UniProtKB/Swiss-Prot annotation:
It comes from the Bacteria. This is Pyrrolidone-carboxylate peptidase. The active site is at residues 81, 144, 166. Homodimer. The keyword Cytoplasm applies. The gene is pcp. One of its GO terms (molecular function) is pyroglutamyl-peptidase activity. The lineage of its organism: Bacteria, Pseudomonadati, Pseudomonadota, Gammaproteobacteria, Pseudomonadales. The keyword NADP does not apply. One of its GO terms (biological process) is proteolysis. It holds the Pfam family Peptidase_C15. Its EC number is 3.4.19.3. It is found in: Cytoplasm. It comes from Pseudomonas fluorescens. It is an enzyme of class 3 (hydrolase).
Length: 213
């Protein structure tokens, strides 16, 4: 049985839940075909340990595809990331109290890595399921970007496709505010559509997904 590794993060910044893990955990064991299934795992939200945990999972599971997910505060849709950059610049401390500023994710590593997922086909599929989605041009500079960069670095040249998706807050996390959110069932359905499309789409579609500024 081939495996698509799907990861989410533990809660951080004093939130009791992280919607990325709440959504991903519901997809654990879902089959994408007769010989492939999703395996969901949770990563720590810490610069020192998230990458190590991800590496162990890859070594243990030998996945055929890896998609990491995380919370994007302020995001209003399923945001499929295009690029990871070689910089840590934490606005807040991580769960171990560390706050790296302007440090490299990988010393002497490339400035950036592009996703190897069919991101525009994924966005199209999520939208066709009636759920808001877009291509994102930045994964930030916190642990999400670090994990995305380390993932692409680890799998470069392996033939294993990989990438990252950001999800919004859950409604209960932002109750009483104007911050955008998405219901958990919509998030789960959107991620499932994205993962299924990623698995079955070897070549991305050619359509606009950029931004003017």
């Amino acid at each position: 049985m081939r495996i698509v590794l799907l990861t989410g993060f533990e809660p951080f910044d004093q939130d009791p839940v992280n919607p990325s893990w709440e959504a991903v955990r519901q997809l654990d064991g879902v089959q994408l075909g007769s010989d492939v299934k999703i395996v969901a795992r949770r990563l720590p939200c810490a610069f020192a340990t998230a990458g190590e945990c991800l590496t162990r999972l890859i070594d243990e599971l030998h996945p055929a595809m890896v998609i990491a997910t995380g919370l994007g505060p302020g995001r209003s849709d399923i945001s499929v990331e295009r690029v990871a950059i070689n910089i840590n610049d934490a606005r807040i401390p991580d769960n171990l109290g560390e706050q790296p500023i302007d440090t490299a994710v990988v010393a002497d590593g490339p400035a950036a890595f592009f996703t190897t997922l069919p991101i525009k086909a994924m966005v199209k599929a999520v939208r066709e399921a009636g759920i808001a989605a877009s291509v994102s041009q930045t994964a930030g500079t916190f642990v999400c970007n670090q994990v995305f960069y380390l993932l692409q670095h680890a799998l470069a040249g392996s033939g294993v496709r990989s990438g990252f998706i950001h999800v919004p807050f859950l409604p209960e996390q932002v109750a009483g505010s104007q911050r955008p959110s998405m219901a958990l069932d919509a998030m789960v359905a959107g991620l499932q559509a994205a993962v299924l499309t990623a698995w079955h789409t070897p070549v991305d579609v050619k359509e606009a997904g950029g931004q003017v500024s």
